[in-house]
Amino acid sequence: MSEQIHNPASEKEKGRVPQYLIISILTIFGIGSQYFSNLSYILNQTVIQNGLHISSNNLLMPSTLSNLAFAFGVPLGPVLTKKLGLKKNYLFFVLIFLFGSIISAVSPEIITLTAGRIIQGFSAGILFLTILPLSLISFPNKIRNTFLFMIITGLFGATALGALFGSVSLTIDSWRWLFYLNGFAAVLCLVIGFYALPKNKKQDNKKADKTGLFLYSLLMIVLAFPLCNLTQKGFTSIYIWPFLVAAALLLVLFIYVDLKAEKPLVPFRSLKAAKPFSGTVMAIASHLALVIAIAGINGFLRNNLDLPFVYITYFWLWFFAGIVVTAVLKTLLYDKLGAGVLGFIGSLAVIYVSAEWRVMGPETSLALLYFQVACLGAGISMVLVGGALGTALAGDIHQASMRSVTLHSIRNFAGAVISPFIGWFLMKQNAVNYEGIRESLSQDDSEFKLQIMKLVQHFIGEGLPLTTAKNMASYELVANAKRSAVLGAYHQLFTILLVISVIMLIASIGKMVTGKGRSLVQKQTRVLLPAPKEKDLKNSVS
């Protein structure tokens, strides 16, 4: 990027706020608002469902389409920034995000809520690579490592705060105020950005590949229908698999076209070297791990532990605490150890958590869960940010933006696609597990009768009559079977998380092997003047 950043020293002389702090605020509130909305929506779906009087199946549509819209907008950000200029592009799409937030906040039905979430997702996707690269280069060289603290606590922190505020919305049984918070953040960005963003000229020398843009747009449209209906209809439905096959063909064609294009929308060729490739795998795998972990642990807390909402709030506070720890460690150690070593450490933390969660039960202590979710937040953020930054700084620095566009486009696309698959997987495994439990009980009549007898005696001991005790025993047995079935589904999901965390570990090792890479804080080389000749010294003394 060639935007002019004001010299921090000159700003200090004028008594102004340093430019890097202003850009950081615009980055956190401009992009983080979408992450905040995503996580708060996941947690407070019950409140929204009751408020809009809709079925649980309809609740998946706003989040699925919002994620797709965000993924669609990510590679368009740099294209529109070059065409419109950074300031105009940023302010325009922040305004669009504000409109989306207002529509979501006042939505009387699921259709308008979905429209608002799509607008939010698309505009935030555009903003992502509009402001994020500027944020990095706005930091002065000597403190550029503090960019890591800003990006981790700001963007990952927005994710954690979204989960935290989503828990609060469950407690107070209200959800619209969360979108008003999004609107407030957008207004703040509009005011600050209008006065503080540097004015820059358009840089549109060559137009982006129109064929690639058309194929990418068509891919998102084709994917929208099956992803919104996958959980309800399943893979075998005629409404699902033909669309997924068509989407797969479009994806292959899009990659082929972009590889051949002179000005590709997503420059896949920029990742062909080993060093950026390993960093990309780190970032993508850790992003998928985050999506899977949040879906699994949120379901476990609600369905198997049945915690009061206040304890769920504490849970996500510990998640945020782990993120803050990583932010500090990354800031202090990134230039010394590199992305590979830190990613290795973070991967081990995620492996530990996933191994524990795949065998945990309702008897698990809250204190242990708090510690484990802190490890999860610390580990995933360490791997993801290290992989993303390590990819950008791997190789020719003039192609850093191209590598970032490719990495973040793939990462967000994969995250948008996997979420509906997680819902389908959990529903399918839950049904399979439940049927297996029912068959095992019906095949072994003696065990079934023994369990019923124990439960009947338990309820009679509590003072219930025999008929009521038998009914309660049957109900309790079915409820226990359902809880066991859904717990088994979460265990299987956490097994997938374990596999992905191992991939994160292998990619981190690959990053270590290929070298630490460029440091954030560059050492300043002093220019030494030649020593004066002895004769000149004598003359100057005399």
Could you say what each language-model-derived stretch is?
Residues 18-74, 112, 294-298:
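Extracytoplasmic
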Residues 416-513, 518-542:
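Hydrophobic transmembrane architecture of multi-pass small-molecule transporters
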Residues 20-35, 42-43, 263-431:
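12-transmembrane solute porter fold
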Residues 171-282, 286:
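Hydrophobic transmembrane-helix bundles of small-molecule transporters
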Residues 66-73, 123, 154-158, 322-323, ...:
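MFS transmembrane alpha-helix packing/gate-lining sites
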Residues 64-79, 128-132, 317-329:
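Central cavity-lining transmembrane alpha-helices of secondary-active solute carriers
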Residues 74-212:
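Helix-loop-helix hairpins in multi-pass membrane proteins, especially solute transporters
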Residues 48-50, 80-81, 113, 165-174, ...:
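Interfacial helix-cap and linker-helix signal at transmembrane-aqueous boundaries
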